[in-house]
Structures are given as structure tokens and as C-alpha cells.
Amino acid sequence: MFGSVTLNRQMGGLNAAAVESGLKLGAKVIWLPTQSARNNLEKQKGDLSKAVEVIRDGKIVPELQDIFQLIKDFDVVLGTGHLSPEEIFRVVEAARNAGVRKIVVTHPEWWMVGMSLEDQVRLVQDYDIILEHCFAQPMGGGKYKSNLPLNLEAIQACGYKNVMVSTDGGQVENPFWEAALEQYIQYLADHGISEEQIFYMTHEIQTRLLNL
């Protein structure tokens, strides 16, 4: 099991000191805001005054540059959290320009992020990022929606080497991760994805991202 740091308000937002402390303790992933992302708050009709902003006046906020440098120096993963597609494009470009090598776009298929397949293809082609595609997305009220058809489409369009199989099984509405992973793998196998490709998406990508 590996740790991570999520840059929500509770962590002080875009707090480079918290990032550095987490990395020195062994964190392997730095997530940009999730619950505190402007996009998340807008879609949940929350208090926008509490948003952790990553873009200001059309530009990446300066605080991100220090965080990018730490991520680069420790050779860990940058996760995009619950940013909007527009924010993701700007952040990914800035992170690549800063030398960040490992970038994961977090569950782009989830309605909270809502990234089109065309944008996912473009991100892969332009920046060679990893797309995290989860088994299901919580819909509220104890319900979830399967992402498997969307995920298969993304694998076919973007290429299996840029799609990471994940579950989001920690969400209370979603199935337990082990059941979700079994169904996910079986679905891919039933729809023409080879054993070698499945292994790559469930093992090799993660091994490389975590420096195992």
C-alpha cells in the first residue's frame, strides 16, 4: 500500500510544504484538488469561495510551479483530481513543460469530470498521459453506474498502453474493489481485449508509475 497527498482545503490547498512532507514520508501520488476543485463545487452547487483554484486570469497559478518541481524531483505521479477538462489541458501542458514525467488524468469518464473521448485522445496524442478508467461512478443515493462500455471505447480509441484499469472501489456506492476488478477484467476479455493487454493495464502501468 502506498500513500498520497490530495491538495484540498484541508491540506492547505496548493501547499508545497505539505507536498514535500508527504513525499519525504513516501507518498507516490500528488492529487490536485478533488472535493475542493472549482469544477467539483460548481457541479455540486457548493460554496465557490472555498474552491482551491489552479487557474487564475487564464493562467496556471504560481503555487503549482513549486509543486511540479517537487513531483519532478521525487519522480512521483501527478493526478488531476476533479478538475474540469479545460483545467486539465492547461495543467497537463504546464506540468509537462516543468518536466513532470508521470501524469494520470483521473477518471475522465466520471460525470464530475466529464471529459469527451475526443479530448482524451488528444491528451494522449499530445502529452502521452495515462487515463485512469474506473469500474463505476457513484451517482448518489446509494447508486452507481457501470463505466465498462465507456472504458472499452476509450481503450480502443486511445490505445491500451495509455489506459489504466482502476475501480474507485473506496466509494461507498460502488462495489468492493475485488468484485469490481473481476467483473472489469472479464468484461474486457469478453470484448476482445487480449490477456497481454489486460495485464499491461492492470500491472505494468502501475509498476512504472510507482517505480516498483
PLM features: residue spans?
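Extended substrate/RNA-proximal surfaces in nucleic-acid metabolism proteins
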Residues: 8-106
